Amino acid sequence: MTQLTENTDELHSIRLAIDPNLITLPIGSKSTSPHSNSTSDGNPESHNTENEEVDNKAGSLPPEQFSNNSAKLIVNPYEKYGRMSLGQLIPLISQQRGPNFKFADINEDILKQELAIENDNGKQESKDDTKAEDGIDTMDIDQNDNSEANTNDIGYNEWSNEPKEDTGILDNTQDTNINGEMESQLTQEEFNKIRKVMLEHINMAMNESSLAMEFVSLLLSPVRESTAVSSMSPFLKKTVNPGSLNSEKVKMPAVSRRDKLSLSILSRGWKLRALNEARAILKKNFTEISSSLKQEHHYWSSIAYNISNKDVLFKIRDKQTTKRSLGLKYGYEDSGSTFRNDRGTAILRGTDEANGLELIPLTLGRTSTVGSVYKGGKFLRVRIFTKIESEGDYILSGESSLDKLFKNHSENSDSKNDDVRLQISKLKFFIFEQELMHQLKKECAYLISYGVTVENEHKIVIELPNEKFEIEYLSLDDDSVVNHEQDAPKANDRRANLMLVTLRMLLIVIYKKNLRQKMVSNTRKHIASTEKDILLIRPLLGKMRHSNHKKLIRKILKECVLEVVPDTELQERSIQSLDKEDFETFDLQDAHIVKLTKDINAFRNVLDVGKTEFTIDMKQSGKLSLILESPNYCNAQVSIKYDNQTSNTHFNTVSTEFKEVEEFLHFLISTYVNPE
């Protein structure tokens, strides 16, 4: 809205809205003024009669005809585009859109999108102009009347905003198939109608841009008159005097000193609050980082102090704390163990205590603690029972003692305070005892016929003619274990301890055999045999049974030969009968294989099957020899050979029954040696 003031009479000024569409002239008029009742000098008689006649004719015409036959207030040089043919207008539009534009890509949807975007931008600009013009005097013009006049004269719609540059909606990359379908649906009449509407909007946009330029020129005329007049249209120069439109700067209300002080205090308060919050956050983070750094230092120092080069560490995620941690491998898998019920892995978790480390075995689950490892730990115990022949019952004559590692163990002891090395040693002991019991039960499946039975999951019984051995898998908290420390020593305690130590050493021999087999598997074919590979109870049982068999042979020889044939003497010697596959020496350059073989050969006397030769020199009657051996550690086989005085062999037989041996010796002595 603007205010036009005439220089001749400021009191009786005429207020007009600079809208050229409201002021029209007949097409054939020669006058430059569209009004017949107002002039620049305020004298109505200065108008000629020709203009009055034209005005009367224009007032008598209908609105539609008057609108079509009228001339715009601003002489727009671009109005000639409306009279161009389609062949001339389309190249101009293509040139305005850009080099990549194709007129065939235009459709109704794209034009609607452009109009909607321009309408939104126009509304935003109008709001900004309204805010900028606060404080400036405006003319009292009826907005509703003007909007109705604009709508009736120029067909106003949402395209009334100023045209903007190409928004890029008509890009060549649009789908040509959709455009082709839209064009195929338009008829010639619809196309002409759309073209007419488009031209009207183009003309309206150019008129509005010209009007905006006129307004800016008139507003600039008080400051730079020469520059403003050069851009004014001839009609505006004649109708409105330059410098008649002005603008003023509205000053903001001054801020008082009190308000400034209040704002300064408020600003400082917010800054102090932000600084205090930042200080608290930094202090909290510093405390947390310092505590974490201290724990990490303590954790790694404990690992460096307690973990040796022989221990195997690996990365693992703790499922309970969901943090990365270190895992310790305390099992014997790398040493040749084939036990898979417990892989022997634990988590090294840091603590705030003195030792700084805590071992959590993975097999115990999330809720288990280190204390439950030792309280629920189990070990092997060997007990020896001697048979009382008069009563037909057994009496305890020997019991293995608890390992020195647990001598000071009690129910109230706190295992968390143990040294890490001690914890690792205990865990290794428990998993070793567990595997030993597992292997013993597997071996017992093949020794049922020799008096070896599994009474329950934690007890194995070995029965001999005069003795009985019990191998138990007990918990450290068992009452019998606690009370055993107070019992008096028994006769066979040392024997029970030696038997338990031998079982553990034989399990180590199995480990070494497995390692050696892995190393030589590429050059030597091996067929795994469960019955043959597990040698724990059989070597011990074979030694004890062989000893009983020797006593029986001595008794038979004494009754059948020594007491019958005079001047006879019994000689006895042991013969080594080694299994070549077990005690083979490999001619290899690998030092590890050679060392393993030497370690295995150190247990020859234990693993060797029993073989004893009995020789009786009967002088005048010849020589009698018996060889007692145990092919599979448990069975007995007796070879009898008799040579006469000329060293001719008369008999060479083998028997597996001692009754047959006794009968054969009685026959031999009574027939060949002492026929009388």
UniProtKB/Swiss-Prot annotation:
Encoding gene per record: SRB4
Region called Disordered, residue ranges: 27-68, 117-176
Protein name (database record): Mediator of RNA polymerase II transcription subunit 17
Keywords assigned: Activator, Nucleus, Transcription, Transcription regulation
Domain of life where this protein originates: Eukaryota
PANTHER family: MEDIATOR OF RNA POLYMERASE II TRANSCRIPTION SUBUNIT 17 (PTHR13114:SF7)
Species of the source: Candida glabrata (strain ATCC 2001 / BCRC 20586 / JCM 3761 / NBRC 0622 / NRRL Y-65 / CBS 138) (Yeast)
Source taxonomy: Eukaryota, Fungi, Dikarya, Ascomycota, Saccharomycotina
GO biological process: cellular response to heat; positive regulation of transcription elongation by RNA polymerase II; positive regulation of transcription initiation by RNA polymerase II
Compositional bias ranges of the Basic and acidic residues kind: 47-56, 120-134
Coiled-coil parts of chain: none
